[in-house]
Amino acid sequence: QADPKTFYGLM
C-alpha cells in the first residue's frame, strides 16, 4: 500500500 502523502514526502 503506497500512500500519496508518503510519495510526496519522499520527494
Curated annotation (Swiss-Prot):
Mind listing the UniProt keywords for this protein, alphabetically? Amidation, Amphibian defense peptide, Neuropeptide, Pyrrolidone carboxylic acid, Secreted
Q: Which residues carry this modification: Methionine amide?
A: M11
Where found in the cell? Answer: Secreted
Tell me the superkingdom of the source: Eukaryota
Please verify whether the record's keywords include Manganese: no
Q: What is its main location?
A: secreted
Q: Which residues carry this modification: Pyrrolidone carboxylic acid?
A: Q1
Picking any one GO biological process from the record gives:
tachykinin receptor signaling pathway
- What is stated as this protein's family in its record? Belongs to the tachykinin family.
> What name does UniProt use for this protein?
Rugosauperolein-2
What taxonomic classification does the UniProt entry list for its organism? Answer: Eukaryota, Metazoa, Chordata, Craniata, Vertebrata
